[in-house]
Amino acid sequence: MKKILAICGIELSLIFKKPQNYLIMFAAPLLLTFVFGSMLSGNDDKVRLAIVDQDDTILSQHYIRQLKAHDDMYVFENMSESKASEKLKQKKIAGIIVISRSFQTQLEKGKHPELIFRHGPELSEAPMVKQYAESALATLNIQVTAAKTASQTAGENWKAAYKTVFAKKHEDIVPAVTRQTLSDKKEGAEASDTASRAAGFSILFVMLTMMGAAGTILEARKNGVWSRLLTASVSRAEIGAGYVLSFFVIGWIQFGILLLSTHWLFGINWGNPAAVIVLVSLFLLTVVGIGLMIAANVRTPEQQLAFGNLFVIATCMVSGMYWPIDIEPKFMQSIAEFLPQKWAMSGLTEIIANGARVTDILGICGILLAFAAITFAAGLKALRA
């Protein structure tokens, strides 16, 4: 054990003796948290959109409520088409979503109604707005199909089944009573934009740091450090354990300091400490495993850093570390289901927003444990080869 701790201590000293590492480990994530958190926070920074409901039916009204239910980035306002067009000309709104007169009829026939989205050329967020609107429409389409199936089984009109099952969810009084009766948690709450970006950028930069740290295995092999350790009666298992422990400790030091810093600087409450410790520990084990896998398949520390950074940055984008995952296309959200960052982010959101404890995130912890087991096994096997 002393030999393992000695190797771990050496690796820690190598990481923290370089001043530039402090910038990438602490300064960069805190700065980006401040910038992105400020950009995404507050109504004044949200995209203001008008909704023109030409159909004025149960489903069109329910669709509007769905759009307004998740307004982290957008502010929706119902108005007439003439008023909306005038406001768009005056640039008082960024765009107009028009719900056509055949909206409910098309949904009843199992078809996908066409959404009309008008906006000015200066709206850079137009693709994201359209994707958000289409995503909400796809959800509504699924709900209508489910209500029609249920109505056939129960022998009642599909509208009655739909009102009973889905429309009631959006009545103000029902969620309030349910939450107070069943639990003292804020069911369905979402973390603030600053808290979400703090979690996302902490995950991103911890992964970047650990990818670079994993490259020290290659450097140690190249410089003959492993050979000298083996001749000094240190086993391969002890060497490997020392490096793995150092990566894990480095990750926790960085994550821990970021947690405390964001709490002091931005007032973020990270929730239940035990849940955070368990979740972050499992995620760090997964990242160590990924680092070992990449290190085993490249030849130089430079290649490790290049491939590692490319993997981390790309997968963090898909997993919603930079922005809310809800605004991404469906196929990207499906890909994110197979990435550990997405599950770590989901767990942290549950802890921060809903006050989740360890028992509440056992499913997420189980998924991260599976990720860790697979990546560790693959990485260690490749290193031995």
From Swiss-Prot:
It is a multi-pass membrane protein. The keyword Transmembrane helix applies. Induction: Induced in response to linearmycins and other polyenes via the two-component regulatory system LnrJ/LnrK. PROSITE patterns: ABC_TM2 (PS51012). Its main location: membrane. Keywords: Cell membrane, Membrane, Transmembrane, Transmembrane helix, Transport. Required for resistance to linearmycins, a family of antibiotic-specialized metabolites produced by some streptomycetes. Part of the ABC transporter complex LnrLMN that probably facilitates linearmycin removal from the membrane. Responsible for the translocation of the substrate across the membrane. Also mediates KinC-dependent biofilm morphology. This is Linearmycin resistance permease protein LnrN. The gene is lnrN.
